[in-house]
């Protein structure tokens, strides 16, 4: 979403046809008609089940700075989804609060991993106690290694910034020379078979109207990124990346 918001803030996106936009609920496409969401990815805390149980985990992502979690939390600092999430964190709470939280996490010996999957795999084998990831990676790992993977997802309180639902957005450039093909691709992503694939095989939340999520996925009550102004998200993406780098988490 960050790069899409960045392109939108530069007036580089084209207008998507109403026949495509109408395939999703109103909150899952831009009011200006320049992007459309096709799947949802919830932010969660993945944890090692040998070390923790749900009742011992915090209500809020803010609580991860507590000394009892020192050295136990992994952060995918350079991952696009994390930077998107941190951009919304800044938008919702202000730069000072968001920066302080990240600095406190570093002071609490949070560990850097390059992406969501590496954190999920590390939590499953007990290398790290827990980490901030997209929900679907752990579902995929459990499906692939049901007998050996020892990690589960944990959701913070429903309205906590740590439970943000990130919409995966698709768009087209205003400068596109293949406008019709671009529209066809956007429509294809929202067809029932493709949406069913996203939820049945990759465990994402489908956004096309009428498509039922995988029964294994918990019902969504989380804060949604669709409620956040994509112009702000795009404009803040670079600043969020700068703050992440300045925090020192990438050297942990």
Regions found by a protein language model. Give the residues of each.
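Extracytoplasmic ligand-binding site segments that recognize negatively charged/polar headgroups
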Residues: 1-128
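A ligand-binding cleft/hinge motif common to bilobed small-molecule-binding domains
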Residues: 2-7, 129-151
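Periplasmic-binding protein-like
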Residues: 23-26, 41, 69-78, 102-106, 112-113, 188-212, ...
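A bilobed periplasmic-binding-protein/Venus flytrap-type ligand-binding module shared by bacterial periplasmic
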Residues: 44-51, 166-178, 197
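Short, catalytically relevant binding-site loops at active-site mouths
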Residues: 80-81, 119, 136-140, 158-163
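An extracytoplasmic/periplasmic, membrane-proximal ligand-sensing/linker region
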Residues: 96, 204-252
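Short amphipathic alpha-helical coupling segments at ligand-binding clamshell hinges
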Residues: 97, 101, 168, 177-189, ...
């Amino acid at each position: 979403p960050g790069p899409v918001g960045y392109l939108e803030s530069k007036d580089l996106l084209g207008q998507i046809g109403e026949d495509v936009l109408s395939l999703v609920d109103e909150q899952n496409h831009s009011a200006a008609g320049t992007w459309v969401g096709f799947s949802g990815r919830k932010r969660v805390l993945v944890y090692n089940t040998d070390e923790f149980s749900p009742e011992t985990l915090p209500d809020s992502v803010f609580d991860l700075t507590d000394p009892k979690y020192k050295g136990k939390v992994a952060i995918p600092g350079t991952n696009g989804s994390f930077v998107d999430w941190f951009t919304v964190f800044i938008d919702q709470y202000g730069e000072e609060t968001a920066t302080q939280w990240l600095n406190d996490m570093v002071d609490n010996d949070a560990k850097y991993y390059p992406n969501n999957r590496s954190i999920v795999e590390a939590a499953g084998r007990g290398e790290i106690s827990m980490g901030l990831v997209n929900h679907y990676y752990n579902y995929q790992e459990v499906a692939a290694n049901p007998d050996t993977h020892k990690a589960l997802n944990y959701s913070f309180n429903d309205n906590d910034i740590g439970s943000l639902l990130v919409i995966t957005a698709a768009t087209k450039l205003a400068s596109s020379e293949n406008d019709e093909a671009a529209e066809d691709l956007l429509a294809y992503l929202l067809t029932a078979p493709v949406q069913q694939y996203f939820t049945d095989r990759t465990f994402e939340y489908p956004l096309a109207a009428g498509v039922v999520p995988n029964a294994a996925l918990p019902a969504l009550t989380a804060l949604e990124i669709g409620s956040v102004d994509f112009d702000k998200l795009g404009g803040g993406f670079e600043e969020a990346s700068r703050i992440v780098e300045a925090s020192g988490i990438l050297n942990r």
